């Protein structure tokens, strides 16, 4: 018998304000057709004035806890994956910890940009497998609207705000791919490409927040190659084939990246959970947002095999294989 980290509840939160491509076309030199053709995005949610990453994270967390049927006091660990924290410190996770009524255990943030949720899931899984934690709350939450240059049509049209969360609980497994829970996680990074996707600000460099900068074509090329490799790694580690996977929940960066990865790996598009059209790229929040939607509408069912994959600035990339 071995310890597995089982997902027992999912939750998400999207700000109420919707911004369509038509609205952006009135502000910058772009059009609905241009945005849809290059990204597949038609709209995005934007946080209200005064609405912070911790607000989004807390709302998603409370919904995940409700779905799991537990209170915040039962949680031993909170990890928030974010590149847009409320403050330089303390960690956004500590704010969530307080707001959900968790008085023991520990909380911290993970920063791996768009790969952040997969990284955070892997960290929580290892804490559970080590026996230090029984129940963990893993959240991806972002307010990327706060770090966008709204005059730069190459970036401002691509991102949105939101949060998603899952509750993990220790369970017993037999050590096979039939076990429910996280079967494996696979993480990578390559800092030599940091200048292809970055924010030009920070406390120690400019003492400013800065804005997102991206070399889109280069990011696309690396994304398809790296994501295909890390998905293949997850399949090989569990002695599985692409046809064994019930659903793929990819990072929702761009429809073309999702389609390119699916084609390279031989996944039919109807196995790919896609929300990018309505949510845009919500960075670390995108996977748990999409996962929660697919669980909520009944597409993803208990016992099914789900593959999560993401790539972000750094570069960072990773995958997680989960039996729901």
From Swiss-Prot:
Keyword Cytoplasm: yes
Biochemical pathway: Lipid metabolism; fatty acid biosynthesis
Stretch forming the signal peptide: none
SUPFAM superfamilies associated with the record: Thiolase-like (SSF53901)
InterPro entries linked: ACP_syn_III_C, ACP_syn_III_N, FabH, Thiolase-like
Coiled coil residues, start to end: none
Keywords, in A-Z order: Acyltransferase, Cytoplasm, Fatty acid biosynthesis, Fatty acid metabolism, Lipid biosynthesis, Lipid metabolism, Multifunctional enzyme, Transferase
Recorded superkingdom: Bacteria
Catalytic activity: malonyl-[ACP] + acetyl-CoA + H(+) = 3-oxobutanoyl-[ACP] + CO2 + CoA
CDD domains: KAS_III
Annotated active site: 114, 251, 281
Localization of this protein: Cytoplasm
UniProt GO cellular component terms: cytoplasm
Presence of the UniProt keyword Cytoplasm in the record: yes
PANTHER family: 3-OXOACYL-[ACYL-CARRIER-PROTEIN] SYNTHASE, BETA-KETOACYL-[ACYL-CARRIER-PROTEIN] SYNTHASE III, CHLOROPLASTIC
Family indicated by similarity: Belongs to the thiolase-like superfamily. FabH family.
Subunit architecture: Homodimer.
Annotated function: Catalyzes the condensation reaction of fatty acid synthesis by the addition to an acyl acceptor of two carbons from malonyl-ACP. Catalyzes the first condensation reaction which initiates fatty acid synthesis and may therefore play a role in governing the total rate of fatty acid production. Possesses both acetoacetyl-ACP synthase and acetyl transacylase activities. Its substrate specificity determines the biosynthesis of branched-chain and/or straight-chain of fatty acids.
Official protein name in the record: Beta-ketoacyl-[acyl-carrier-protein] synthase III
Organism of this sequence: Paramagnetospirillum magneticum (strain ATCC 700264 / AMB-1) (Magnetospirillum magneticum)
Lineage: Bacteria, Pseudomonadati, Pseudomonadota, Alphaproteobacteria, Rhodospirillales
Gene behind the chain: fabH
């Amino acid at each position: 018998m071995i310890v597995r980290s089982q997902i027992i509840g999912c939750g998400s939160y999207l700000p109420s304000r919707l911004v369509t491509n038509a609205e952006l076309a009135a502000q910058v030199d772009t059009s609905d057709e241009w945005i849809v053709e290059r990204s597949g995005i038609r709209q995005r949610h934007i946080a209200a004035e005064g609405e912070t990453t911790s607000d989004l994270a807390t709302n998603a967390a409370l919904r995940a806890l409700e779905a799991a049927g537990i209170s915040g006091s039962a949680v031993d660990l909170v990890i928030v994956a974010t590149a847009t924290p409320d403050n330089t410190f303390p960690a956004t996770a500590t704010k969530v910890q307080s707001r959900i009524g968790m008085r023991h255990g520990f909380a911290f943030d993970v920063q791996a940009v768009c790969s952040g949720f997969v990284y955070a899931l892997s960290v929580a899984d290892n804490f559970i497998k080590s026996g230090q934690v029984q129940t963990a709350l893993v959240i991806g939450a972002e307010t990327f609207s706060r770090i966008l240059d709204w005059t730069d049509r190459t970036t401002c049209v691509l991102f949105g705000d939101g949060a998603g969360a899952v509750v993990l609980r220790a369970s017993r497994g037999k050590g096979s791919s039939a076990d429910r829970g996280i079967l494996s996680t696979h993480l990578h990074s390559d800092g030599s490409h940091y200048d292809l996707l970055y924010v030009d600000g920070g406390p120690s460099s400019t003492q400013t927040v800065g804005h997102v900068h991206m070399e889109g074509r280069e990011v696309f090329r690396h994304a398809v190659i790296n994501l295909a490799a890390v998905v293949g790694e997850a399949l090989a580690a569990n002695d599985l084939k692409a046809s064994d996977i019930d659903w793929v929940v990819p990072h929702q960066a761009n429809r073309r990246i999702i389609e390119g990865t699916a084609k390279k790996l031989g996944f039919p598009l109807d196995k790919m959970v896609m929300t990018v059209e309505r949510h845009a790229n919500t960075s670390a929040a995108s996977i748990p947002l999409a996962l929660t939607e697919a669980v909520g509408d009944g597409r993803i069912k208990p016992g099914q095999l789900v593959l999560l994959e993401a790539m972000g600035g750094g570069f960072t990339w990773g995958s997680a294989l989960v039996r729901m």
